[in-house]
Amino acid sequence: MPIRHPVGYASRMKSKYVDGFLVVVAKKKLADYVTLAKKAGRVWMAHGALGFYECVGDDHPAGCGIPFPKRAKCKRTETVLFSFVTFKSKAHRDAVNAAVMADKRM
């Protein structure tokens, strides 16, 4: 699936653990979501995440499993993003996420 990366931060370290999410966003609110995601990405990276990505699908071809928009039950006025954060390990993820949730910027 071709993707656009409105937000993407990465370090050079290899990741071994990933948190991934499908996020449904109203198309007319996508710019607002990207602004919020950029702020969130900076917070995750400041607390040690190895990478932070927000990917918007441009093309969801049939015959490639269940396309994300169908799986996420998107309306025609919505789009779906595949968002993921990378970490060294599950323990590293747990520590980073705890710090992020305690961060006043969130």
What are these regions (language model features)?
Residues 2-106:
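Short S/T/G/P-rich N-terminal loop/turn motif that feeds into the first structured element of a domain
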